[in-house]
């Protein structure tokens, strides 16, 4: 309030000069007063590049990426000479809007104007390309950074983690350690999350030991450590981390521990922890996520009762969790009832309901809800997760025509960039329909894009399609690509390629591959049965 009064007095007294206003704009930007920033910006008799940069940052910080791009276009038309500080918020806007082509055009303009040289601008480029899933470009930009600082290293590590490349993220961390880069709590937290996602116990314990030995702030890393031990099934170790923090624990840590107990079916401890605090939406939502993972309907219903008693059932986030839980437990009627009762449905609400029908094998109903969402009256636009759920539903239900329509709509109508999982699901749809020519045209279009390599998961999907449709020639090409790109030490790929040749009746090749697998001492991670 005091800051607002000072800004008002500044404007009223007429002390509006370029230099003085730039200083106030920076202050307003830091405090995130977007309206005041707009007012000050409009009052300027002259606008220099510094004030324009501040306004760009203000728009982005206020969550208005479209306004950021619109202002940037005006600046570029009026002043062709731009600084690296001008481009940084623009790259952030491109990242938020998922406009790969626009992002590349901005990058090209940076190179043309010599604004790509700074570490800050290159870090923004690394972040932008990783959000597009273009990790090859992220690595290329990172390698061009002359003075790599902690922020640029963290941007690369986060990019791999964001795209599900856990092993590569750990490789970045190992390189940071070799290069003696000063590692922050953020870095360690990211690495712990990677270990949790990959369920790598030994490396996670090593990071925990590093935290203790180097005297890092365990309060900052506590939630990540609790989540890690919970994910690998060591709930007692998670309890030890929580108890070691004593008075420094917070609600987020407790919620993480409760969720971990439920995921590991330690219900007695979970409800004991719940009794230590007043029930809240956050802890109930995280607990419902555990019930969804375990398909535990009885515990989910108990949590639903707690939510009803405390008047939380009007909260959209909690309702989304309830829908997901009932859907995963096969209770589609209850999920639908909760969905219809939500007054203001978010994109998560719609997606959760679509997914509930999808996981229960009703692709037609899933499409019905999706079309209802896309109607103008809903006021909600589908995102990439929504399309992944819908395309997956079409794949499982064998809805080829509808799957094609959804995949095309994603790119053309909503300007969303399909990710690896979208392509895998779409290839599965085409494969079951026997449309191998369409699959190959899709692969050829992807190969024409030299800036992005085709992920291994897509090649695996194409190989499965070749196997299903008895396409030996193309299957052999894909098999060679997989063997080349994953390296000679990947046992799973050897088995996958071997199974392809077995389906083709090429038993001599199968025997040769199995022999190589044995001679190299490679062992495929074995599956397990819940019954045997």
UniProtKB/Swiss-Prot annotation:
Residues 1-33 form a transit peptide. It holds the Pfam family E_motif. The keyword Transmembrane helix does not apply. Residues 458-532 are annotated as: Type E motif. It is found in: Mitochondrion. It comes from the Eukaryota. Its main location: mitochondrion. GO terms for cellular component: mitochondrion. PANTHER family: PENTATRICOPEPTIDE REPEAT-CONTAINING PROTEIN. This is Pentatricopeptide repeat-containing protein At5g66500, mitochondrial. It comes from Arabidopsis thaliana (Mouse-ear cress). The gene is PCMP-E38.
């Amino acid at each position: 309030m005091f800051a607002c009064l000072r800004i008002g007095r500044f404007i009223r007294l007429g002390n509006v000069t370029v230099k003085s206003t730039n200083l106030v704009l920076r202050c307003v930007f830091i405090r995130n007063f977007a309206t005041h920033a707009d007012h000050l910006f409009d009052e300027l008799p002259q606008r220099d590049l510094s004030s324009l940069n501040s306004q760009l940052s203000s728009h982005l910080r206020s969550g208005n990426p479209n306004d950021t791009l619109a202002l940037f276009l005006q600046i570029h038309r009026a002043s062709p000479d731009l600084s690296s500080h001008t481009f940084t918020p623009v790259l952030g806007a491109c990242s938020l809007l998922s406009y790969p082509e626009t992002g590349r055009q901005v990058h090209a303009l940076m190179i043309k104007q010599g604004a790509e040289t700074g570490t800050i601008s290159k870090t923004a480029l690394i972040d932008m390309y990783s959000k597009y899933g273009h990790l090859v470009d992220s690595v290329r930009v990172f390698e061009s950074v002359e003075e790599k600082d902690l922020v640029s290293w963290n941007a690369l590590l986060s990019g791999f983690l964001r795209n599900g490349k856990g092993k590569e993220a750990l490789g970045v961390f190992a390189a940071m350690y070799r290069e003696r880069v000063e590692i922050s709590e953020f870095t360690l937290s990211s690495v712990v999350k990677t270990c949790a996602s990959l369920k790598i116990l030994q490396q996670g314990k090593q990071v925990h030991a590093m935290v203790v030995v180097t005297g890092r702030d365990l309060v900052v890393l506590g939630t990540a450590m609790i989540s890690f031990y919970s994910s690998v099934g060591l709930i007692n170790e998670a309890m030890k981390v929580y108890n070691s923090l004593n008075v420094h624990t917070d609600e987020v840590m407790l919620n993480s521990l409760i969720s971990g107990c439920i995921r590991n079916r330690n219900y007695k401890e979970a409800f004991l922890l719940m009794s230590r605090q007043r029930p809240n939406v956050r802890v109930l939502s995280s607990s419902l996520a555990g019930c969804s993972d375990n398909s535990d309907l009885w515990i989910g219903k108990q949590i639903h009762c707690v939510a009803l008693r405390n008047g939380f059932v009007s909260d959209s986030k909690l309702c989304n969790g309830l829908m997901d839980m009932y859907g995963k437990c096969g209770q589609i009627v209850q999920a639908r009832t909760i969905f219809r009762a939500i007054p203001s449905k978010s994109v998560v609400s719609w997606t959760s309901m679509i997914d509930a029908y999808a996981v229960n094998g009703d692709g037609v109903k899933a499409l019905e809800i999706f079309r209802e969402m896309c109607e103008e009256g809903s006021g909600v636009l589908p995102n990439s997760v929504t399309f992944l759920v819908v395309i997956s539903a079409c794949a499982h239900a064998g809805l080829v025509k509808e799957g094609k329509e959804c995949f095309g709509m994603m790119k053309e109508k909503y300007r969303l960039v399909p990710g690896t999982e979208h392509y895998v699901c779409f290839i599965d749809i085409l494969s079951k329909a026997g449309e191998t020519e369409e699959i190959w045209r899709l692969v050829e279009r992807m190969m024409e894009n030299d800036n992005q390599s085709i992920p291994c998961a897509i090649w695996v999907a194409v190989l499965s399609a070749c196997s299903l449709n008895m396409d030996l020639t193309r299957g052999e090409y894909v098999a060679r690509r997989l063997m080349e790109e994953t390296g000679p030490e990947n046992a799973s790929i050897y088995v996958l390629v071997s199974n392809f040749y077995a389906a083709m009746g090429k038993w001599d090749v199968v025997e040769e591959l199995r022999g190589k697998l044995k001679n190299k001492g490679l062992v495929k991670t074995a599956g397990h049965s819940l019954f045997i």
